[in-house]
Amino acid sequence: MPSRFALQLSTLFFLGVPLVPAQAADVTIKRDEYGTAHVYASEVYGVFYGYGYAIAQDRLYQLEISRLSTQGQVAQALGKDYVNFDIGIRKNYSPASIKEQLAKLPQADKDILEGYAQGINKWLDEIDRNPAALMPKQFIDNGFTPQRWTSFDVAMVFIGSMINRFGDYNSELQNQQLLDGMIAQSGDKNGKALFEKLLSVDNPDAPTTVPKGEWQPSVRNGAYVPAKTKAVAQQSPKPLPLLALNDPTLAWESPKERAFSNIIVLGAKKSKDAKAILLNGPQFGFYQPAYTYSIGLHGAGYDAVGNSPFGYPMVEFGYNKDITWGSTWGAGDNVDIYRLELNPKNPEEYLYQGQYRPFEKRIETVNVKGEKTQQVTVYRSVQGAVVEYQPEAGVAYAKRRGWEGEEVATLMSWNKVSKAKNHEQWVDQVQHSAINVNWYYADNKGNIGYALGGRYPVRVQGHDNRLPVSGSGDFEWQGFMPFATNPQVYNPKTGYIANWNNRPAEGFPNPDQWWYSWNTADRVQTLFTRLDGRPAFTPSQAWDLMMEAGFEDPNARFFVPRLVKAAEHSDQATVRDAAAILAGWNYQDLDADADGRYDSAATPIFRTWLKHMLALSLGDVLPKDQVGKFLSTGHFTPGGGTPGSQNIEVGTKVMHQAMIATAAGKAKGFDLFKGKDVDALMLKALQLSIDELSAEQGPDAKSWHTEIAHTIYAPKNFLGIPQAGEKEQMNNRLAMNRGTENNLTVFAMDGVQGFEVVAPGQSGFIAPDGTRSKHFDDQLALYGDLKNKRTWLTEEDIKAHTVEEKTLTY
């Protein structure tokens, strides 16, 4: 058996740092009835060596596709169809920067990544000795073999799928095109006024996670400072092709995905039969194999259990004996786009501080299976990666990120959250997370807490963060706001914390994406209303609350009461009948009789009404080429499936905001309804819905129906790269607006208890003969039936539930 020192030699020099030899040591892996691995070791290296080994047994093909996807190397394995994808990925990150960060880590932190990598490689060695039984069938089917892993590979899976996914959202180029289009259609004044409605910087009535009055917006007064030089006008020099960021060489995914997360955290006074309760539902989408991987880490300062996306080297959603933690996307804006003026005599130079300077550039070689290699030039300005390069137009666009250079530090802070024993130690790790992710806390004393992570820039006054700004040097960031200015709260007066990617706190600015905003209408109200409706919750009641919220149409509560009232005195019987059906609806989209249709006729009535109401409100005020973005209701496709979650769409939020303002006589700026009576418009939309449904399904309103949608576990990862065979796709019968996984931690009076459901299952392994792992889909029915399974933390509980045990030596 090779020693740890020998195993490290294969990756010794990629960081250029000598590694210290160690004596051979043991790792014990114990698996429970659902295949969850609990790793025991006395060294950090050993703990993560066991983790890497275990996940390689279960998820090797997914791991390999994740490695290739996040580094832009898919074409070398899957062929020429992925060349443009690889080019886009290569442009979006700097391998040299990541390696430099890794090289600076202390040895104990290097051991996390190196141990994990060598654990994977240990399993690769075992496959080499018995490929006929151990090689995952997907490799055989696709004609390539897994490669050995390094620390860099381990880090890049986290960086590429978490930081470069949730931390990198930006639609400033699209926003500019949207503004230009509205000005062209409605004139300068009205176009800008409409833009302010669609992409408002601040909506004071948007619900917040930090209760109003428990965080002071004034702490962010330093977010903008006077310019040191005269700022240039923010104008788009030339119209760009519509939605330039949708170009396949630039897009990481659709700019409007259905993901994100929800959570409830209950403190001592809001918990019944418990000291504190945390229930998280991270919504990454639904995939085969499961997006998250369950793990227990025990030893060398770790004693935690939970799960983590892609099997990151950490417990991202979990607990130890003292605290529990969770997270959701925070949506704070710490990414900006800069417009660069190219030198007309040399387009590889750009204007900065009055002089043309050369771009940093590197040549990337893209290997292509069965084809010639391709080369691409990747540019970088002082602001960051060049994401749009148009030499023929004399312009380029660069992206500056608040987290750049802190990717590895963020990974390590997330890893060490699981070692915290109290709120102070938890905050000490969260403050080092550079991306815009919300973090949540509860402990065995009944305390609860929340903090928005991320580094947020100090911008120059006049910098509209929704639009690209000049990259000539006038709008450079002036530093970063301290963590203390991020919204946070400890033991709020409400006794609970809840979030569904809503606004963190009053005064915190809206996101800059055209497809995501914080308004009065927010799906988090489905949680707030239920939490406020009961003085305290048992753990099972908290679970039921989250499950029930997952079936509610998040739009309905904001429109149905007013629509019903408006229809009360209609002289049309069909309108009154439809309104009566809506009045009796609890906003739930269920299929209790399992006939493949949602139970209430209110579902088709409301969905069709919302479609028509959006068209009547927004259809003729937005440019033809852009209006479609804002007319979607966001509902799941009847009879089809969705790999993600459901939110209130921006068009719907803006329409609702305008309805409130009009009713209160406070409408300002652009009049969305053009002076029309809003109630009359609502009734017109209802009549159009009645006409449409009558034509399609007959005149009996009570018989109108909508086919159910399903929860699809897609065989492609979030980047659209196949990570499983097409025949591996599966589904739960009814679509649910809930977490990809759900995890529940209960600090009971006699200790901590954990529960989770991670569908379809722990393993994605299929043997060469087609035999699937027994844990391939053994949590699919649990998820569909709204149930969960226990997780285990103590040595006694783990021993009692161990069905398989293995000891490794490294």
Stretch-by-stretch model annotation:
Residues 2-23:
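Gram-negative bacterial Sec-dependent N-terminal signal peptides
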Residues 25-288, 299, 308:
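Substrate-recognition/specificity elements adjacent to catalytic centers across diverse enzyme folds
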Residues 50, 97-111, 400, 412-417, ...:
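Second-shell loop/turn segments in exported
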Residues 94, 98, 109-119, 410, ...:
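Stable alpha-helical elements in mature extracytoplasmic
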Residues 299-309, 318-323, 327-471:
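Glycine- and hydrophobic-rich flexible loops that cap the catalytic core of alpha/beta enzyme folds
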Residues 335, 395, 435-534, 588, ...:
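Hydrophobic alpha-helical segments
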Residues 513-571, 575, 668-810:
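Terminal end segments
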Residues 606-693:
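Charged, long alpha-helical assembly modules
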